[in-house]
Amino acid sequence: MTMHHPNLQQHDRPQGERPQDNRPQAISRSYLDIRHVVKQFGSFTALKEISLSIEKGEFVCFLGPSGCGKTTLLRAIAGLDLPTSGSIHQNQQAITFLPPEQRDFGIVFQSYALFPNLTVEENIAIGLRNQGMSVRDALEKVEQWLEMIGLATSAQKYPSQLSGGQQQRVALARALALSPGLLLLDEPLSALDAKVRTHLREEICQLQRKLGITTIMVTHDQEEALTMADRIVVMNHGVIEQVGTPQEIYQKPASRFVAEFVGTMNFIPVSMASSQQLRIAESFIALPKIENYTPCQGEQFDLAVRPENLELVTRYNEAIPVVIRHLEFLGAFYRVECVFQGERLAPPVYVDLPITQVQTMHLKAGDVRYLALRAGQLRAYRRKVMSTTPAATASCAYAA
């Protein structure tokens, strides 16, 4: 390992013989190859048959809610929590049960983990010196890194004299100083305020692209994942829900969970009135193109549509009357909360509109307007709560 903090502990290291995975393993040339990884803590299974390949130079985000298994997977890659079964290969070398100090990675934690009694210079140099580098060469390399992270004048300061963002830059430089093959980031920005977080994530991306280092970042922040990652791994309850580019995750969620978790999504209860007509509330519209689903006549389901793919219009046949409940100003646009007319107990529908349109239409709470679906990027998912009206039992294909 290229960086080791003295307070890191290895947990649940199997005693005696290591469990063997006798399943045939496909040959992979990916930089990091994870196959059928399971991690159990007593009777609780934190990771369930996780398989994932990461290419050299990729920036990958593990995204999901608390308890989904993303940090456990990161710790398995680092050797801090060894898998119960499965295999992990880095650069075609088996590392599944190697101790952290024998692995090729640098790691940055949410808590910075800097030594408070050492200066910035000493914090970055400690790993270099531990590997036998001369004082002169170590200080020369530290100077280069301080220049790179914008802290050239802070070499003699102590961590307590730095802001949170500056401390995290030092932690990043320390992790990268030994030129590891893999950089692991465990929610490194979550303790910072919003403005610093935005600035630092840009710096991390620039540094990652400049170095070309394979990077994995754990986060629960959708915006971080969407703006930073080449690919996102969405996790839930110890399984991978979807792997894809930020655009794929946002525009083509593979499951209802992904659709709910990433961004804002409206789930509009609908039913098939006929083979060509959709019923929404008390209105009927022509059946739009649904990307992931072929509906059956009489079936009930939820139509998933982003707020930016809805619009409020003057009345026409393909629009649904709604009552505006609230307008939320979000700087670049308004988010308009609506309910279907005559169905005040139904879930609200959110529409994102340009400021100029809201002003031109003189929209205000209590107004009745008409909701229209923009063509494209419509998806469908099964209802969470079963309707009292039996749905059609014909074979209908959902994504999830």
Task: Identify the role of each PLM range.
Residues 86-94:
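Conserved ABC transporter NBD signature motif
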